[in-house]
């Protein structure tokens, strides 16, 4: 259990101000603001250690953004500001951030249900329960690994991993590897695997950031990209409202590992995997690949079925406006992809969104009793 676990625990009859569910960068950033507002809060995280969401990813992963953009509110990221931190450095930073500000994080807590009893929210995790006036969903959108139905028809001899399970090539069987998915994770994992295995990557290209990734880009290009991601490609601008749905459907452009890098490493590139025939993957052009391993870099499904509140559209989409769930006063969300901007699930994005959400929560807290709705807080001029 985390060293911060002594701060707050479930107590019968005690009503907290806020329960934040999720102790990654989004939950920690917002928690920092809420503690500064002198709120009685707890941050619940399913992992055994703060930062494990990063720590448990593939070994060679580095952040796409330079360190000067990777800090959270109140604590700059240490070290080389133009360098690109490893996933372990990012994990350790988050752990240090929670300790530095004394954030009341409880680790190893798997929330089963969020509901309501009377005026308060109830958060259940096994035999434990918390009551609160506010709940923040900070679990992101990467809940359930998504793989196609036909994956189950691959031959038993084919080793299958989702990108969330991949750490390094020692997990793989001898023989060719097929990486399914041509996004950033697919490209990076394919390049990693190609050092020891014959590798093919399958999928539709998502485009590329047309600059070479490195220190020069960190100095001159990423400040422009960051500004656009924070202030232009948002639902608050006409261009953002047009572009964001397309970006959400199409996927992010390749940032560090480009098609030319894959070609230089000898990685074969093919079209989409559309089926399985005789236990082998079938490509859109009808060709069949004989491989010993498949790594599914096919993303995740959102799963908020444990939130037992009238906060969703018919298709299960959370109804929120910049993190505020107006249909359920006191319910908020942060760190979700495209929640407000293209950067909403990134480190720079959660820093911006956490400050905004904390202002909204403060406005609701101080609103007159007759104006308790989130709409009333919005009309009070919170921006």
Enumerate the language-model features and the residues they cover.
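Glycine-rich loop at the start of a catalytic domain that most often binds anionic cofactors/ligands
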Residues: 58
């Amino acid at each position: 259990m985390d060293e911060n676990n002594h701060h707050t625990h479930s107590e019968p009859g005690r009503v907290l101000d806020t329960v934040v569910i999720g102790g990654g960068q989004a939950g920690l950033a917002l928690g920092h603001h809420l503690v500064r507002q002198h709120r009685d809060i707890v941050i619940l995280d399913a992992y055994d250690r703060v930062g494990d969401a990063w720590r448990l990813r593939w070994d060679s992963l580095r952040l796409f953004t330079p360190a000067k953009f990777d800090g959270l509110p109140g604590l700059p990221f240490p070290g080389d500001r133009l360098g690109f931190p490893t996933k372990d450095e990012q994990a350790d930073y988050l752990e240090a951030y929670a300790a530095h500000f004394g954030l009341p994080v409880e680790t190893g807590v798997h929330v089963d249900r969020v509901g309501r009893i009377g005026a308060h929210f109830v958060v259940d995790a096994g035999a434990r329960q918390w009551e609160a006036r506010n709940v923040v969903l900070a679990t992101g959108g990467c809940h359930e690994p998504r793989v196609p139905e036909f994956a189950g028809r691959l031959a038993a001899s084919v080793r299958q991993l989702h990108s969330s399970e991949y750490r390094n090539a020692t997990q793989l069987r001898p023989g060719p590897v097929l990486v399914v998915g041509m996004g950033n994770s697919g490209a990076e994992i394919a390049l990693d695997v190609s050092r020891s295995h014959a590798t093919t990557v399958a999928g539709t290209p998502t485009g590329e950031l047309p600059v070479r990734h490195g220190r020069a880009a960190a100095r001159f290009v990423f400040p422009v990209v960051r500004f656009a991601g924070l202030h232009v490609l948002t639902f608050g601008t006409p261009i953002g409202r047009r572009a964001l749905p397309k970006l959400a459907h199409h996927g992010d452009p390749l940032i560090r590992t480009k098609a030319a890098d894959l070609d230089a490493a000898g990685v074969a590139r093919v079209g989409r995997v559309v089926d399985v025939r005789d236990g082998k993957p079938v490509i859109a052009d009808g060709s069949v690949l004989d491989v010993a391993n498949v790594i599914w870099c096919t993303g995740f499904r959102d799963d908020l079925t444990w939130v037992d509140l009238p906060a969703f559209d018919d298709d299960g989409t959370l109804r929120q406006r910049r993190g505020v769930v107006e249909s359920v006063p006191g319910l908020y969300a942060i760190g979700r992809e495209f929640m407000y901007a293209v950067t909403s699930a990134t480190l720079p994005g959660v820093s911006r969104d956490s400050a905004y959400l904390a202002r909204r929560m403060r406005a609701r807290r101080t609103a007159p009793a007759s104006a308790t709705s989130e709409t009333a807080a919005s009309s009070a001029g919170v921006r």
